[in-house]
């Protein structure tokens, strides 16, 4: 390999232009710019150290970059207008260049050095980048690209989306009770994934009944079908229009998740939320849907002044709140479980944690735990079982 020609080729990436912001390019570029043998040795070992920090296989680093890159070609491919032949030819040419980098061995860089001792090197493996990338393009609506290919749950800050590195591992299989509520949300989500008409959903009910866990478990179950979750706090509602617009051309499906949604009288976000649910502030998009949870059926925190006002004012407030809740289209109620359901949930968790208690002992202890704490709920059931597992481990 002629290293100078290879270096020049690496300077011609347009589709994969973000390569020039990658740590790998920073290390390679330093090597190519080295003039003395000492500089070459230093930059070469810096490159090796970086590759080692990523697992020691240069091929895998290049593959991760190519498969996760978010570029203009993908956006064109997703648009109804289709892709441009000129850009496609550039993409193919650049993949051939990156294939050379994928296969680059350490000896190719240090073979002309006069250094007489052994130098570090890295691993490579055989793979066809063009074939791998074509498979990714064919599955964009399920696998996504960029950070959406690496993560499936996100939060929002002033700089944009922040991946959740360690998302809640809650699974549908581990959930007991509330089958009717859970199935209603699953069916709505499946319709959404299939591009059918689906409703924004409000999960209303007592604290600890599994509203948020249900949403996260559904996303975990269908992430491989292209489902992603973006958690937005109530204080960030003003960012929703721009967030939804930014997702407009993304091939994946997004649940905008707002936990513990509620408003106070005169809250400016109340009107904005109502407008968003009506589709008035952003285009009607088929790839975003809003799922919210609340402990208040009509989403409004009622102050003492509200209750002390006139009946007309009080009724107007209730009607206004009800009008927002009705915009969700699908309202699912999660009530605190009765004793029998609570015990079924406890037994489900006890089996998962392999507790060594008879059913009668389990029921007595679980009921006592609920009385001492926050009453019967799926959350209380899990807390009891986790506590009991600790007790057993200490005996």
Where is each model-derived feature located?
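Conserved catalytic/switch belt of AAA+ P-loop NTPases
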Residues: 264-311, 316
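C-terminal alpha-helical "lid" subdomain
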Residues: 335-395
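AAA+ P-loop ATPase mechanoenzymes
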Residues: 1-174
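Conserved P-loop NTPase mechanochemical-coupling segment
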Residues: 169-173, 212-235, 301-302, 394
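Walker A/P-loop nucleotide-binding motif
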Residues: 178, 195-215
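Conserved AAA+ ATPase "SRH/arginine-finger" region at the nucleotide-binding site
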Residues: 310-322, 329-341
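AAA+/P-loop NTPase substrate/partner-engagement loops
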Residues: 221-254, 262-266
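N-terminal pre-Walker A segment at the start of P-loop NTPase domains
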Residues: 164-190
